[in-house]
Regions:
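Extreme N-terminal starter segment of soluble prokaryotic enzymes
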Residues: 1-3
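Extracellular beta-rich ligand/substrate-recognition surface
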Residues: 7-15
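Exposed loop/turn and edge beta-strand positions of beta-sandwich/beta-sheet ligand-binding modules
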Residues: 17, 29, 63, 102, ...
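Glycine-rich beta-strand-centered segment in the early N-terminal region that forms part
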Residues: 22-39, 49-92
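Cytochrome P450 core scaffold surrounding the K-helix E-X-X-R motif
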Residues: 43-46
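NAD(P)H dinucleotide-binding glycine-rich loop of Rossmann-like/cofactor-binding domains
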Residues: 84-145
Length: 145
């Protein structure tokens, strides 16, 4: 069992519930993480309020975190137990532990803390997307990131 922040219905902050959840073994292509830091993002408010629909309810909120790989499922070759990793874009981060698709995981170098990784991964990927895909920044242009 792990503690998680979940919603059983959409709404305001009072919809958040802190409860025990069952965390199973990782399936093929998945990793089991012990999460040590979790990012807080405005998109989490959208899911809580129902502006972005969760795939099902109850739902565990949160889109990014960092932690330590505890176990891996079949066909996982790039990540192994003991690796420090971060990820973004996978709903369910507000939990002590969880399974996540291993191909979403990014190994962390020693000079980036778990807290730093959990606070910057989603924002960094968003900034990269905006300056590489939405508007290709040209030499001489000024941007604010």
């Amino acid at each position: 069992m792990a503690k998680a922040v979940r919603i059983h219905e959409t709404g305001g902050p009072d919809a958040l519930v802190f409860e025990d959840v069952e965390v199973g073994a990782p399936g093929p292509g998945e990793a089991l993480l012990r999460q040590t830091a979790i990012g807080l993002n405005f998109i989490d408010v959208y899911f809580r309020a129902g502006l972005y629909p969760a795939p099902s309810l109850p739902a565990t909120l949160g889109m990014e975190a960092a932690g330590v790989v505890e176990a891996v499922g079949e066909d996982v070759t790039d990540i192994e137990p003991g690796d420090r990793v971060t990820y973004a874009g996978a709903l369910g981060a507000y939990a002590e532990a969880r399974t996540v698709a291993a191909d979403r995981l990014i190994k962390l170098p020693d000079d980036i803390s778990d807290r730093q990784a959990a606070a910057m991964t989603l924002q960094g990927l968003t900034a990269q997307y905006l300056i590489r895909r939405t508007h290709r920044v040209a030499p001489g242009e000024t941007i604010l990131v």
